[in-house]
């Protein structure tokens, strides 16, 4: 079995990103990412720190805007508008989830599509489904890069994606379709789920159920991408597939951790750098 090691690829790409940032600085532009965090959700704080740490590592400018949990939607939208208008800001990211008094859709739609490094805006999602250039959700983008790095061609393959979220399942389906795969999206209402997943040449598991997919649900020789992050009672982290059972059954598989996760932040940095390159072109 080939191990699809996201951490190793992320480290390679991080070195390349450091060089790209140095080149941009020589041209008078420092890529800048602004992360907005509303409230003090512990998980959000960890994700936010990881993003800032990586940005600093590659030499980018990074700013965290911390707002209280009582922040109104109008106040948050006003901040987003200010950042949209700031020419020194390349990427804007609003850490989700938001407090209940704020409509997430309104906020995502307010972010300038050209600065929407999460790739969640309706404009970017529309461009993705039309197979046109735009900013793409980072986890699906990272999955495609990981497959490409291991020379796994998805064209003509049967791809089953289990999970239909706007963050992973739906955008990944579009990317796979654009790469000429035959795509099926499965979800909680799918009948005979494991019979369906067993037909997949490439299986993407993103349902949040530890060890849900074993040999009975996976075709021999398949490629398995495990997006699941599940914390067990002993504190360990595991994915949606039974990694141990499948090691001798599949041709390639991502581990959890060290698989898809490291690629997500790496793609976030890459998109911010690409936006900064466009700023250089505009002068």
Swiss-Prot record:
GO cellular component: cytosol
Reaction catalysed by this enzyme: (6R)-5,10-methylene-5,6,7,8-tetrahydrofolate + NADP(+) = (6R)-5,10-methenyltetrahydrofolate + NADPH; (6R)-5,10-methenyltetrahydrofolate + H2O = (6R)-10-formyltetrahydrofolate + H(+)
PROSITE patterns: THF_DHG_CYH_1 (PS00766)
InterPro entries named in the record: Aminoacid_DH-like_N_sf, NAD(P)-bd_dom_sf, THF_DH/CycHdrlase, THF_DH/CycHdrlase_cat_dom, THF_DH/CycHdrlase_CS, THF_DH/CycHdrlase_NAD-bd_dom
Pfam families: THF_DHG_CYH (PF00763), THF_DHG_CYH_C (PF02882)
UniProt KW keywords: Amino-acid biosynthesis, Histidine biosynthesis, Hydrolase, Methionine biosynthesis, Multifunctional enzyme, NADP, One-carbon metabolism, Oxidoreductase, Purine biosynthesis
Record-annotated disulphide pairs: none
Statement: the UniProt record of this protein carries the keyword Cell membrane: no
Annotated pathway: One-carbon metabolism; tetrahydrofolate interconversion
E.C. no: 1.5.1.5, 3.5.4.9
GO terms under biological process: L-histidine biosynthetic process; methionine biosynthetic process; purine nucleotide biosynthetic process; tetrahydrofolate interconversion
Sample GO molecular function, one term: methenyltetrahydrofolate cyclohydrolase activity
Binding locations of NADP(+): 163-165, 188, 229
Family: Belongs to the tetrahydrofolate dehydrogenase/cyclohydrolase family.
Assembly and interaction partners: Homodimer.
Function: Catalyzes the oxidation of 5,10-methylenetetrahydrofolate to 5,10-methenyltetrahydrofolate and then the hydrolysis of 5,10-methenyltetrahydrofolate to 10-formyltetrahydrofolate.
Name of the molecule in the record: Bifunctional protein FolD
Organism whose genome encodes this protein: Latilactobacillus sakei subsp. sakei (strain 23K)
């Amino acid at each position: 079995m080939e191990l699809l090691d996201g951490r190793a690829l992320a480290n390679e790409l991080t070195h390349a990103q450091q060089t790209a940032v140095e080149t941009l600085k020589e041209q008078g532009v420092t890529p800048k990412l602004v992360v907005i965090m509303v409230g003090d959700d512990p998980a959000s704080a960890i994700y936010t720190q990881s993003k800032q740490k990586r940005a600093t590592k590659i030499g980018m400018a990074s700013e965290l805007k911390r707002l209280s949990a009582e922040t109104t939607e109008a106040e948050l939208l006003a901040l987003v508008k200010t950042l949209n208008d700031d020419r020194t800001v390349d990427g804007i990211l609003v850490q989700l989830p938001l407090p209940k008094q704020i409509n997430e859709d309104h906020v995502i739609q307010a972010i300038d599509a050209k600065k929407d490094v999460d790739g969640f805006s309706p404009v970017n999602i529309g461009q993705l489904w039309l197979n046109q250039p735009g900013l793409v959700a980072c986890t699906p983008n990272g999955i495609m890069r990981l497959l490409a790095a291991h020379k796994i061609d998805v064209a003509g393959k049967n791809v089953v994606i289990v999970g239909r979220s706007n963050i992973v399942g739906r955008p990944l389906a579009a990317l796979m379709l654009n790469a000429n795969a035959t795509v099926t999206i499965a979800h909680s209402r799918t009948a005979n789920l494991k019979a369906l997943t067993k037909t997949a040449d490439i299986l993407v598991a993103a349902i949040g159920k530890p060890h849900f997919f074993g040999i009975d649900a996976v075709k021999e020789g398949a490629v398995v991408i495990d997006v699941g992050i599940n914390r067990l009672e002993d504190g360990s982290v595991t994915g949606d597939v039974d990694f141990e059972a499948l090691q001798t059954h599949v041709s390639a598989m991502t581990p959890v951790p060290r698989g898809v996760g490291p690629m997500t932040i790496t793609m976030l940095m890459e998109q911010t750098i690409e936006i900064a390159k466009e700023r250089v072109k505009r002068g």
